[in-house]
Amino acid sequence: GLEYGISLEAALGALGITLKEVPDWNCCGASAGHMTNTTLTRALNVRNLALAEAAGMSEFLAPCPLCAKELALAHHEVKEHPDLLAQAQDAAEMAYRCTSRPITLVELLHRNRDLVRERAAGKLPDLKVACYYGCLHTRPREVMTFDDTEQPTTMDEVCQILGLQTVEWTHKTECCGAGFTMSKPGMVARLTGRILEAASRAGAEAFVVACPMCHANLDMRQGEAAADAGLGEEFQMPVLYLAQALGLALGLEPPALSLGTHFVDTTDLVARLQGQQPVAAAASEIEQEK
């Protein structure tokens, strides 16, 4: 997720959006929290909501979809149930008036798509990409309401503004296996392999994602996932964060967006996105000249 944080801050800064960190924020509890102790997880998230509220933030950016979901769910639960609010406030030792809510990066950019259009419209070539939302960007539908649960389009619309060609495909909201990547890597390889196969079948040349867990599984586990799906040892499909695509469209250089740290090499993809000749093609031409 380090690439995500670096590229997000750089891209939003280039877009003219300044980030201010919620003071003294804490972990949302992640998968371990909501699987083992919902009371603790709710209290952890109410504390973050209360901190954002105290800082005067009616809305705040939660770049990780899992964090955004946990925050939105806690907000929804305590707003609807005063007893849960009292319980969470006691545990967090903070008052919360239910006036602050999280938004994701996709929601932020889609809401500000006129600004994106003004600064970065058509700056990238019409490379075919699969926008992969993962299982949490639009779920549960009761709290993640900014897009359609099964057929979201907001990330596609932002990518299209940048000039990318988004493909229609079947697995844009299927789960990649998330945190099971450490305890059940075989299962993650199967799930991720199905996603790779579906994107490849739709003609995609790269993924665009906005979730660090999805990125990790598609990028880090791609070799074994491709093998599981029967795609062959040579299969490679680069995985870009939405923030990295935006940063390139805004003219930022690859190092500023941490594009050199992926498991699946992004060199040729970035060259194409910058309107340059891919490295492999250039090397082939040099060999022919010899």
Language model region names:
Residues 1-290:
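Iron-sulfur cluster-binding electron-transfer modules in prokaryotic oxidoreductases
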